[in-house]
Every structure is written in C-alpha cells, then in structure tokens.
C-alpha cells in the first residue's frame, strides 16, 4: 500500500465516513433517496450512535449525530412519508430513547436487552428478568415504536447483562465453544431451543404480544438451523431454505458460488426443512406462525396499546393486559416446562367473559374472586376481553 491510514471503528475493511464533511452528509442523503425511489420500505440504521467523532468523548450519542438524523427524517417525511427509519443502537433503552428525538428522528429503535432476558426467563422458568427490563423501559413519543426481536443476523448479544447472567447464558445455550462469538452466542432460534416446537411457539407468542413491533428473522418462521463450523457470524446467515431442490431454491448458480453453503445436517437440512414442505403441511411451524401474525393484525392494541403486567400468583407465569380503546387483550404465558396453575386479579374486568383468540372459546366469566387458569408446559393464552359485560350481550 501507500503507507497511509484511515479511521475505522469496527472491522479494518470498514472505513469510517467523515460526517463532518457536508459533501458526505449530502451524498448519504442522496444514497437514501436512490433506494427510497426504488420503493424500499425503510432503513435499519446500523450502529447509528457513531456517525460523528469528537475529541475527548467516546464518540457515542453526540449531539451532531442527532442533528443529522433530524435532517434525514425531515427530508424523508417531506417526500416519502410512509417509510421507516429503524435505529440499531446496542445500548440500554434509557440511552436509545434519545434516537426517537421528539418524534422527529427515528420512527423505531431496537430494544436490545429484552431479547436475552426472554431466553433467561424461560430457562430459569421465572418471569422476573422480563418484568424487570420492561419496568426499566422509558416512555417514547407518540408515533414511535420499539422493535423487538428474538434473533438477528449477529450473535445473541450478551453485552447488557451482568457477568453472572452472561456465564449462565453461556452454560445453558452455548455448550460448544464454537457457539460463542464476540460477546454473545451465534446460534439461530431453533437450535437455541433444541428444536422444541412448544418453546418456539411460546417465544413467538411473546414476540408478537409484548410492547413493540415484532422483527422476525428470516428462517425462524420455519425453524431453520445454523452452521457453527462457519466463521464469525456466518453460521446464522446461510441461504433461506425455500425448496428441497438445488441450493434449497435460493439460487440456480453453481453450489460453490453461493455466498455461504446451505444447511445439510440431519435435523435442519434443506431437503426436509423448507418452505415448500411446510406449506404442504397444515400443522407446520410456518402455518402456525402465519395464523399468529394474522391474529395479531386483527387487534390494533398489540401495536399501539398500553401494557400493564398483572401480579400473577405464580412466578413462572407472565401475564399482562394490552389496551387500546375497547380493544383489550389478556396474555398469559407459562415460562415453565411443567403445567402450572395461576390466580389473576381481574376484578377490574368483573362481569367480562374472556374469549380465547385462536379457537374462539368462551372461558368462565370474571368475578370478584381471583381468576384461576391452568396452563400446559410452555403454554400460553391470548384472550380478548370484550367491552360488553356478559349480561349486556
């Protein structure tokens, strides 16, 4: 080379752009416009806290970064009002909330610390980790939303847990050293849950019902596996498994030219695990996930409603109510692998007949006494709580 240097914050092949330069700012907005004009729905703003640098700081969350985001948002709102900016900032919610601004920066932001605590709660069979992080999540401006997720294209990050919790997660979910990467676990959802259909359904039900917009990682809807023999994060980035045909239907190219090899192991191999086969099986995870998403879409409270956790008598049960006007939903989740009873204080809804959403079954009327439910291991209920009392129907 020429013996010259450039600044980079992450990999050596990722030079940092100089946002101090107005020409760089304009060029980036031009790049955004190029893709927006092609019809893209929005952008995930990767590592958004690090746009600007300033001597004497750690270069995170600087005021000029927020000023530039406001400019980007203003330009997008003017010409592309139906598009979304999703902030990716691997920080605590109290810091990330700044990227909403006053509703004039990003529309959405990922909620990172919730994800490992879902895994922790189910393995410990106690709701406390989920309850704690949700209670620490600040309010956000109207028109903004958290993006919640179970897995993504990186490792399951363990940056925002204690050392003790990190060791626990490694021991429970990363038995092989190859499963670890950076400060996290590089595994997909299905292998993390040992391919347990019950657990995958419970995790997905939590993803679709907790506060925020669900971000579903490709392949998790069919229970795709990973390849821990591939380097760094590539193990969870293998081609989508569409069919049992050449290259899993992802491409017709020579298999050696694929960006990564398709999964070919006995459990998650593409020949048996693919979209085509699951579309032909009415009981498949894919059909179940589509039904759950359809159910969610019929209840606006899941997207914009308030969230209130109920103090369930059983610590293995996570129960909460989502409300948006007359659209009221009760969600009850059993984090234990064993059947569990629970008594809920539903006196506020006395006289209401809960209706289970997926089957339409009417459950016993809510009275003044604690409301008793029993749930199978890793089971859950979604109930509507109709505004009309039973005697008014």
Predicted regions and their residues:
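Active-site and adjacent substrate-binding regions of carbohydrate-active enzymes
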Residues: 1-393
